[in-house]
A protein has these predicted regions:
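Basic/aromatic DNA-contact patch characteristic of tyrosine site-specific recombinases
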Residues: 1-102
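Short, conserved phosphate/pyrophosphate- and ester-handling motifs at nucleotide-, phospho-/glycolipid
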Residues: 178
């Protein structure tokens, strides 16, 4: 009788544990879904200010990237498009949505290197922005992914980012407090 009672309690405890783990899984999933919905909404808002081919890019990379990665790519591409509008004479009268793939295809590795130099210090909407080696590397990685997608899917016929070296990340010095 005692043995049967212990087995019964063990089964009840096991069911309680399963119910608790199911509850936590559902709770975590609900949080994850909320964050994902919020991120997708933000991404759609960012895409509204981009050329139409960017939407295809974000749809294409969706299965292999997280929503936060796609948002970071959107910010980085937005910065690149702003740079083109500001510095490229053929883009002076255009908006971001008007940028054509032909323009992206005409860019050279030197143009990409000039963009990286621009990123080290620029002013946007009256606010000064700087990027260290890590920021430059991330923005170039975003741009490379974008160009690679366009090249792989035959939107463009050359990828100038392929010939640009990634910025070297130097080790941070260890500062000791005395």
């Amino acid at each position: 009788m005692v043995k049967e009672t212990l087995i019964c309690y063990a089964i009840i405890d096991n069911l309680t544990i399963k119910r608790r783990s199911l509850f936590f899984t559902m709770k975590e999933k609900a949080y994850y879904e909320k964050v994902n919905i919020k991120n997708e909404t933000l991404l759609r808002n960012l895409q509204a200010n981009m050329p139409p081919y960017c939407r295809q890019f974000f749809i294409g990379i969706e299965p292999t990237t997280s929503s936060r990665t796609r948002i970071a790519y959107a910010y980085d591409l937005g910065c690149f498009f702003d740079y083109l509008l500001e510095t490229n004479p053929s883009c002076r009268d255009l908006t971001t949505q008007d940028l054509k793939l032909e323009l992206l295809e005409q860019l050279t590795p030197l143009d990409i290197e000039e963009y990286l130099a621009y990123l080290k210090y620029y002013v946007k909407d009256g606010v000064e922005h700087t990027n260290d080696e890590r920021g430059l590397k991330r923005k170039l990685a975003s741009l490379r992914t974008f160009y690679h997608y366009l090249y792989k899917n035959d939107f463009i016929h050359q990828d100038p980012t392929f010939k640009v070296d990634m910025p070297k990340i130097h080790d941070k010095t260890i500062i000791r407090l005395d």
